[in-house]
């Protein structure tokens, strides 16, 4: 008869300080298929180490171990996991059930790693539990079951993938006498069905029930009774369970099950999961809120600047602001305005002549800023009218004594009058008819309290100031033309006309660009602060996951014992970290929506928009945080030695 398990000259040594301790010495053993074997020995005799080597949980330091003719030393970690998953079933003294899973889910765990389908897996688990007398307790948690019932769940788990070889470590050690008898009867029945059953015990009464007893002492086999009866070699009904599903379906199924297991693990520690998410929620909400609220603030600033007049260029006499050289003060004249208006890139032109004068109506006398402008001035600066109409070309040509006032002036001169068009006021000493009132512009910079009025520039020059030159000329560039290139061309034009460069310009687009750059810089700074909070949240996730790995070390050992590969363990903990971060990210985005609504409630002029790219980036960021900060705990879990993990309390 071909041997199922063969050990030749097995030695297992451990480093203990500076000394090397031999736990197993020159162990040679052959176990045939269908045998019921008991390995008996006192505590420290090496029997548990021998069982770990037989179950491929550990490797010998020397010697050869073959399973069905295959040298175990030639197998990598994944192949060893496959061997445990497909051929071995473990029954532990302390049951080693996962506390957050039901009895049925505990039994299903080995089949999850074998890639068995969900429905087939569930039917098989229920069938095994029913066969072992637990059909009415499939949904019970381990803490709702007695010791004997928990051990039967452990037996069902060992049989889930076939359990060609059943390794039972002190299976009756934690049970009462009645439960012990039941468990031993089940193990004998499994041997009769064709399973190879190996029991490790220190109890001679338990060992005596086996057909073959092997005594071990101080790491050496002292006695081997040999098999009393011819072993049953008929194939067990549950031996072969090779899933027929294609590999990609197995991968999808494993990922789905890992996701479910991650969710169950998170649900088992709701408070800790919520506190872990809190850092991610705050971080994501901060980043998204700063992006969208910052963008709303930026758009409001730019809108205010555009209201002043975008795509416009102001031309001033002299070299720069504050230049009071008399030779350049009169540089800008009417002919310059006409020459500029003829340029192809110019949409509108308006000269400006300014001064401070007294305004009077009845017995009210106030100081105001008076500006002489052309009919195109109001279009250049995008100014709307509250009442009446702006200055017209006809009024400019005939030096009309007309005036346009702002709302501040209306409130001061006409405090009890709503319609003021047609009223006559004194501008300086000149009577002027009010033809329009400029509408007030809402601005985040606040309201301007100064009084301003506008008259035709021809009226200002000839009737009020008595001069023919302008203080400045403002031009509006046509859409589609580069403001910078237009600025260079008009400077070149006026320099040629004047024979020298006696003017300077101020491009409003440069103010717009400066404001945009400044707001972007501030937004970037605030975003970096928010990202720091997100990183802190990620570190919190890593910290909690490392704690979780430590707390769940025995669970990791159980999963490895039933066939989980290192990659399966790593995948599960990575998925848990990513799931925490994704849910935290979703809640963070929801919080940022609430923040946006509150901002709009208190600041109605702000338009909060959540672009899809920002939301996608937030979810991507959550995923990356989960992967980056979940990798170290996941790797730590995957690198655990199953023997050490199972021994951890």
Curated annotation (Swiss-Prot):
Gene3D superfamilies: P-loop containing nucleotide triphosphate hydrolases (3.40.50.300). It is an enzyme of class 7 (translocase). It comes from the Bacteria. InterPro entries: AAA+_ATPase, ABC3_permease_C, ABC_transporter-like_ATP-bd, ABC_transporter-like_CS, MacB-like_ATP-bd, MacB_PCD, Macrolide_Exporter_MacB, P-loop_NTPase. ATP binds at residues 41-48. Its EC number is 7.6.2.-. One of its GO terms (cellular component) is plasma membrane. Its main location: membrane. GO terms for biological process: response to antibiotic. Keywords: Antibiotic resistance, ATP-binding, Cell inner membrane, Cell membrane, Membrane, Nucleotide-binding, Translocase, Transmembrane, Transmembrane helix, Transport. It is a multi-pass membrane protein. The chain crosses the membrane at residues 274-294, 420-440, 524-544, 578-598, 608-628. Residues 5-243 form the ABC transporter domain. SUPFAM superfamilies: P-loop containing nucleoside triphosphate hydrolases (SSF52540). Homodimer. Part of the tripartite efflux system MacAB-TolC, which is composed of an inner membrane transporter, MacB, a periplasmic membrane fusion protein, MacA, and an outer membrane component, TolC. The complex forms a large protein conduit and can translocate molecules across both the inner and outer membranes. Interacts with MacA. PANTHER family: MACROLIDE EXPORT ATP-BINDING_PERMEASE PROTEIN MACB (PTHR30572:SF7), MEMBRANE COMPONENT OF TRANSPORTER-RELATED (PTHR30572). Part of the tripartite efflux system MacAB-TolC. MacB is a non-canonical ABC transporter that contains transmembrane domains (TMD), which form a pore in the inner membrane, and an ATP-binding domain (NBD), which is responsible for energy generation. Confers resistance against macrolides. This is Macrolide export ATP-binding/permease protein MacB 1. The lineage of its organism: Bacteria, Pseudomonadati, Pseudomonadota, Gammaproteobacteria, Enterobacterales.
